[in-house]
Swiss-Prot record:
Lineage: Bacteria, Pseudomonadati, Pseudomonadota, Alphaproteobacteria, Sphingomonadales
Protein family: Belongs to the class-I aminoacyl-tRNA synthetase family.
Residues at which ATP binds: 623
InterPro entries reported for this sequence: aa-tRNA-synth_I_CS, aa-tRNA-synth_Ia, Leu-tRNA-ligase, Leu_tRNA-synth_edit, M/V/L/I-tRNA-synth_anticd-bd, Methionyl/Leucyl_tRNA_Synth, Rossmann-like_a/b/a_fold, tRNAsynth_Ia_anticodon-bd
Short sequence motif named 'KMSKS' region, residue ranges: 620-624
Name of protein: Leucine--tRNA ligase
Entry EC number(s): 6.1.1.4
Biological processes per GO annotation: leucyl-tRNA aminoacylation
Molecular functions (GO terms): aminoacyl-tRNA deacylase activity; ATP binding; leucine-tRNA ligase activity
Organism in which the protein naturally occurs: Sphingopyxis alaskensis (strain DSM 13593 / LMG 18877 / RB2256) (Sphingomonas alaskensis)
GO cellular component assignments: cytosol
Enzyme's top EC category: ligase
Gene: leuS
Principal subcellular localisation of the protein: cytoplasm
Keywords: Aminoacyl-tRNA synthetase, ATP-binding, Cytoplasm, Ligase, Nucleotide-binding, Protein biosynthesis
Amino acid sequence: MTRETRFGALAADARWQKAWEAANSFATTDSGQKPKAYILEMFPYPSGRIHMGHVRNYAMGDVLARFKRMTGHDVLHPMGWDAFGMPAENAAMEKGVHPGGWTRANIDAMRAQLKRLGLAIDWSRELATCEPDYYGQEQALFLDLHAAGLVYRKESYVNWDPVDMTVLANEQVIDGRGWRSGALVEKKKLSQWFLKITDFADELLEGLGSLDKWPDKVRLMQENWIGKSQGLEFSFKFAGGAPAFAVFTTRPDTLYGASFAAISPDHPLAEKLAKDSPELAAFIAECRRQGTSAEQLETAEKLGFDTGLAVEHPLDPDWHLPVWVVNYVLMDYGTGAIFGCPAHDQRDLDFAHKYELPVHRVIADGDETAQHFTGSEAYTGPGKLVNSHFLDGMSIDEAKAAVITRAEHEGWGKGTTVWRLRDWGVSRQRYWGTPIPFIHCAACGTVPVPKSQLPVTLPDDVDFSVPGNPLDRHPTWKHVACPICEGAALRETDTLDTFVDSSWYFLRFASAPTDKPFDPEVIRRWLPVDQYIGGIEHAILHLLYARFWTRALNKLGMIDIEEPFASLFTQGMVTHETYSRPQGEGLPPLYFTPDEVERGADGATLIADGAPVEVGRVIKMSKSKKNVVDPDAILDQYGADAVRWFMLSDSPPERDLPWSEAGIEGAWRFVQRLWRLFGETENVGDGGEDKGLARKLHQTIAGVAADIEALGFNKAVAKIHALANEIEKAKPSATRAEACAKLILLVAPMMPHLAEEAWTALPASQRTTPMVADAAWPAADPALLIDDEVTIAIQMAGKLRDTMTVAKGADKAALEAAALARPRIVELLGGAAPKKVIVVPDRLVNILP
């Protein structure tokens, strides 16, 4: 074929993507003889357009998947769509489209965009969680978990999003607001379905220790969320001796610092008292309109209601503590009741200051032992016990143990463990989700849908003209016969939290299309996922739920593994500076897209009027700030390989990547440099073997392989740049021609279209396979991985003056003679003999003139 002088990226992209598809190049192989590599990026929500964060995420996974194919692995690298969720319903309400049609159109658009990147994906494994063949199997698994006692239904206070009109899990409440709508979350009592994740709290916590290929930060986040706390549980008595309520504390050492007792607004005692107190009832109602997360309550103003009741201090019955209902105690942690120790807990201190309650110091780090504590910040550090009777002089740990021992001996309390983790509420009052497969019968109660009647599919004829769940209002869908008595009954109209959908999709991918949720034998071959890639924002939600789901299925005997993801990588975000103008006092800035702005050395101006705009800081790309870059536009301009190269090259993959025109331009120029180099594979010239270049080539082969294995893509890119530089400087030789040909294979995982084009142009004798997609990674010669030459620094009076390359291990006399013969050193000495020469073999020669 005639070779173009410039690489035509767009034509090559289209040509090779078509060729790979025709050859089924990336179909999953399962020889049973090769090691397996299951590479998976977190599947996307089909919003309609991919963004640069997607591009970076999938480029990383693709490089690893292609590399694993080249190194002799059976590779599973699938793609699918996390396709249920509220945005589709919002589109239905705003645009009058059906959620299913909107979602499937978005999937088609995003699939086409992803294919433009040249991803080595087995598209035959594609799935969408909104299709009955997926969610029907999810319903079957849900019934299996129910049969095993891991699913239950109860009435409880839930996090209610008043805008989206649905329930949120605790993990979906961020700073007291719904994670999607941003609305302040309220508390509401509803009948809900729960998964018993708390049954697995201990093993989920202990299992983190085996995940040595997960980021420490993610493991710590999960550990804190599971929240194992050991402490004392005891029961207060009302003044007079009648039982009052139980309390759990992790700080029994501070009992002598107590100045009040507090209960949650949702505590049974608070609700009982509210029946006879309109003021307390109003206070409780106000608390429930506030946020529900621990984070929001931490920062909110501390409010309380004095019940007028008092309880006896457990260590001194004559010491009475007032009982308050407070807004910062959660019913779903511990017992929903505490004792307040203001001197050593900031929330209690803020509350005590507001309501003028006593503040008693019981821990001191130094000489300050006065009982009355006057500081504005609670002391939470180490120290010894003071003002605490029999505990005085003990360390905190000693005092904790002493109080628990006394409580157990006297029978008023016991040492116990509680968990921050709560059971997973999975009910959602939405249409676009997996229908929960249960039926409510007046005679038989709540009964499961028989598996023979699965899937329970969503009706298409739904009305989104008013907020709420359209399934509740559907005239026929929810009316069914009871599967037990055949009498009139109602379907469950709640749907499952979409995080259920993503808790097992990796199992379905491995099994390909099947009439079961998955094939246990296939799962035994492919799971766990060898490399999982996605954002750290999923550390608690998705990743914890997937771990629970895997362990639950293991408990049911359906799979052998306990952990779904052997190795986890959390990539950084793609960021961009913002461009804006102020709109006036009290108004948000007016933002502009990068296409609307001309960037110069002194700032930026709006193209439309030439006037300046404010250049903001570099932040995550977002539609609201308009600092997004359209991948399609960049692909149209530079082609897939330049985009992939830039995504991999400019920053360590775990860090954020600032988008820049200079960066993508540099990637494009390097693509063209390589294209020119690849045209010189037959130019052997008159030169013989180039040992230095051969060594550089084989060191690069080994180094790039190690970097890709470790997901150090930027390091691999740097090594390839360095090798290209050496090849360009080298004289024509057989070694140089070989290096050019091997370089094609080294860049193939990152620049697959360029590599295919260059591979095809090679002489047939140099090609081991018709396409580079099927080629093997080049072998590095171990003998060439060790340098037999070193670069020596030559100093004069300690200052660097020259360098020289010499044989490794050269003796001191040879190094001194070589250094003194260097033209630069001869010039600097001016014919004079040096006073002294200090030689450090293989490192430096220091000449003292």
